[in-house]
Amino acid sequence: MVLSDNIWYLWSEAVDNASYDSLDLLEDSTTEEILDTVGDGMDQMAPKLGEVFRYMRDNHLYDIQAGEDSVERTDGSYTVGLPSYRDAFIFINRDNTFRDYQSLIHEFGHFCSYYYNTVPEMYQGFHVDVCELQSQGLEMLSTRYAGSLFGEGDSAYTYETMSDMLYVAITACMIQEFEEAVYTTPDMTLDDMNRRFKEIQDSYDGWYYRVYGNMCYDWVDIPHLFYSPMYYIGYGTSALSALDLWVLSGEDWDGAVDIYLGILNEGLEAPYRGTMDRWGMKDVFDEADIKELSLELGRIAGTGSMEAEEAGNSAQPDGEAPGVSANETSAAQDNRSVQFIILAGIGTVIVLQVLIISVGLVILWEVRKKR
């Protein structure tokens, strides 16, 4: 999904209609073709990942198909643990687009985490930030092989994967702000919730959910809000770390893969900030780190691809920024727009994380009063 005209402009010269047309051809892919393609990508990325993928496939630990008219299937995709077998199982309800490939890569990241986990089920917990990085990080790393996997669709696939992460980083902050507004106002009516969600979305420039008059009620389609309160923000923090890993992969591919494999071996309950620090990654709650990440992403977006960025680094003389075009001033302005989008979202993350403590105290106080 396109986040803004600025981001689309930065990538428009590299992503043309022909690339999207090539991705559209994947609509006719069979499940076996999807498994073959993603399996090849895992083999190219790291032999260990290829080995785990073959284990998953040989033991039929997946259900990947589209629902037929007479068969009802759960929407979306997920991975569940099978603790009695010390295994996991991937479920994907296909929508017959290139997203089926993305879904398998994402869920395979979760599968790998279960594969390497050694803590018995009854003793284990999990940190959503790390768990989602194990899947989102694999999505971002897979873009390196988009050319061999998707042919002419490589630039469109890379753009869609990167913009998905930016989208999640921003909307996760928006959802968190909405949750806190609801929990700190126990008497809020449904209409008030719908109006409040629209107000919050408007403060984020209103790009994300459909508006109906002065209300926006598509938040009801987010199941996490009902069964796992305050969970969704973890998708945003992990998305930023996935983007950080992607930037690192352009500087040191082998090092980035080693970091990813190391994070997989951290297990399901590794603490987020401690894990990021241990592997030398940016702290998404540190303003300086986020500013640096936004600059790096803006520079890469300005060149149109990670490959162009790498080529630019080797071709530019010392002191000259890579990827600068003849329209240098306009590109710089667009880079600042990208930075603003990311910084605005992260600023909200920092504030909201502090407010979570207050929300908990309010809830505890209400419970005590009822008793």
Give the label of every model feature segment.
Residues M1-F89, K282:
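Contiguous, non-catalytic segments that form substrate-binding/exosite surfaces or channel walls
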Residues N6, L10-A14, L104, S148, ...:
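C-terminal, non-catalytic "cap/extension" segments appended to globular domains
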Residues N17-L26, G50, Y85-T97, Y114-V128, ...:
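Glycine- and acidic
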Residues Q44-E51, V80, H110, Y114-P120, ...:
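Conserved helix-loop functional segments at active or binding sites
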Residues D95-Y115, S135, M140, S238:
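Active-site recognition of the HExxH zinc-binding catalytic motif
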Residues H127-A156, T161-Y167, S238:
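Post-HExxH zinc-binding segment in Zn-dependent metallohydrolases
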Residues L352-R371:
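C-terminal membrane-anchoring or membrane-association module
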